[in-house]
């Protein structure tokens, strides 16, 4: 993104070691959660944003944007704060997704 002569490629605002010992990185600028192999550095998958590999199910807003605080919780679901500045109308919310990494689906379980 270009703002007053500055290029903002990545705004990483959370990183977490996932249950399989890989990394979950939240990149706010591109609206993406990126799962990275902790050993090789290879991208395993991308959820959200322009390179999205997932289908969002039961989510009337079809995903998140400008997210913060991405976490994998004990039941295996992913929670995050959806800043929502790209939604119409703009709507911030806390969400929980049930993620099937094999099928590449992300089902909205809770939205507050």
What is the meaning of each model-derived region?
Residues 1-112:
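Histidine-/acidic-rich catalytic cores in large beta-rich domains
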């Amino acid at each position: 993104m270009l703002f007053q002569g500055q290029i903002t490629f990545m705004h990483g605002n959370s990183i977490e070691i996932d249950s399989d010992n890989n990394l979950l990185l939240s990149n706010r600028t591109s609206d993406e959660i990126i799962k990275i192999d902790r050993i090789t550095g290879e991208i395993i998958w991308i959820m959200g944003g322009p390179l999205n590999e997932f289908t969002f199910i039961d989510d009337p807003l079809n995903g998140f944007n400008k997210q913060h605080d991405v976490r994998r919780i004990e039941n295996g679901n992913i929670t995050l704060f959806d800043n929502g500045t790209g939604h119409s109308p703009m709507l911030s919310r806390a969400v929980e997704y049930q993620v099937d990494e094999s099928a590449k689906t992300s089902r909205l379980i809770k939205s507050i």
